[in-house]
Each structure stands twice: as C-alpha cells, then as structure tokens.
Amino acid sequence: MVGCRRGDSGSPSGPAAADEPASILVLGGTGFLGPHVVEAATARGVKISLFNRGKTNPHLFPEIEKFRGDRDGQLGELEAAVKAGRRWTAVVDTSGYVPRHVRDSATLLAPAIDHYVFISSISVYADPSKVGLTEADAVGRLDDPSVETISEGSYGPLKALCEEAASAAMPGRVTNVRPGLIVGPGDPSDRYT
C-alpha cells in the first residue's frame, strides 16, 4: 500500500491519473502504531492526512493535514472534507475498536477512498493459539453483540465485528491486517525492551 499510485480500482471516486501520488488518511496516527505508519508513508512520498481527537501527542506532524473529531459521533470535519470533494487513495485505520465507529467511518469515507486498511488483531480468532491460522478460521463472537466495552474477553470479538463493519461498508475494498503482537519504540505496554 505504501508507495502505491492511484489507479482505477472501480471505486466510486473513479480512476485517477496514473502519475497522481498516493494519499493516505490515517485514522488515529499519533498513538503507538500510527506514527510509524505516517513516517514510513511520508518517507516514500505519500501524502498523509490525519483524523483524530488531537489529544494524544498533538505536537506530532505539524506539517501534515489534520482533521479533528471523535469517532463516537463527531466526524464533522471529515464529513465536510468528503462533501467538499476530498479524496484519498486509502485509509489506514489504526484506531478502530468499536464496530459502530468503524461502520460510521467506513460508510462516510466509502465514496472518497479506493481502499480501507483496518489494523485488526490475531485476537479475532476463536483460538489464536492455533498454528497455521488462515482467514477461513473461526473468529470469536460476543454473547451480546451490543457490547462496546473493551476487555480481555471482548477485544478480539470486537475487532472481528469491526472487520465485518468495514467490509459491509466497502465490499471488496478492505484489507484486514491481523498482527499477533505489535511492539517497538513508543510501545506504552513496556513489552519492548
């Protein structure tokens, strides 16, 4: 995805000129994973925009276009940009944990992007300890799908529902990335040594 060029993906935004540089909207972007995504993309000449609350590391990336809001019903700046014709090659969603938020974001952005990349988790699997997992393996489910509180027992099933929400809003245009454990500089969990 990083370093790609826009092309005719069959998206509602239509084909773009072959020499048009890629542009990515990062949902989040200033927490743990997001800055690494932003830095890798900008190093490759990709134009980046950020959408977040502006609360975590707001000093980061002063040169990058920013949209402020909250995924919990405060998408106004992003909605205005989409209505004004703003388009991106892709979205990288580093801050999706609640299916309703992912559904709302993906639905809003569907006409404005070619592809949606959702950072999910290996925890989506009903049995993440299984060797040789594939996309065909069963995902965990919540007894009550209206649950939005993140806990050890709900995290994986919520991420699975987020994947489904993005895919429902943008059929055929979603990539779900299911990392096992993300560690590295800036990790607030102290797993990185």
Regions found by a protein language model. Give the residues of each.
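N-terminal Rossmann NAD(P)H-binding glycine-rich loop of SDR-like oxidoreductase domains
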Residues: S23-R44
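Conserved Rossmann-fold cofactor-binding substructure of NAD(P)-dependent oxidoreductases
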Residues: F67-W88, R100-H101
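Active-site Tyr-X1-5-Lys
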Residues: D144-N176, P185, R191
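Conserved sequence/active-site signature of Rossmann-fold short-chain dehydrogenase/reductase
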Residues: V124, I182-G184
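N-terminal Rossmann-fold cofactor-binding loop
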Residues: L50-K55
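Active-site regions of enzymes building and remodeling cell-envelope glycoconjugates
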Residues: F61-D70, T134
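NAD(P)-cofactor binding segment of oxidoreductase domains
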Residues: R86-L142, A160-A165
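N-terminal export signals
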Residues: M1-S13
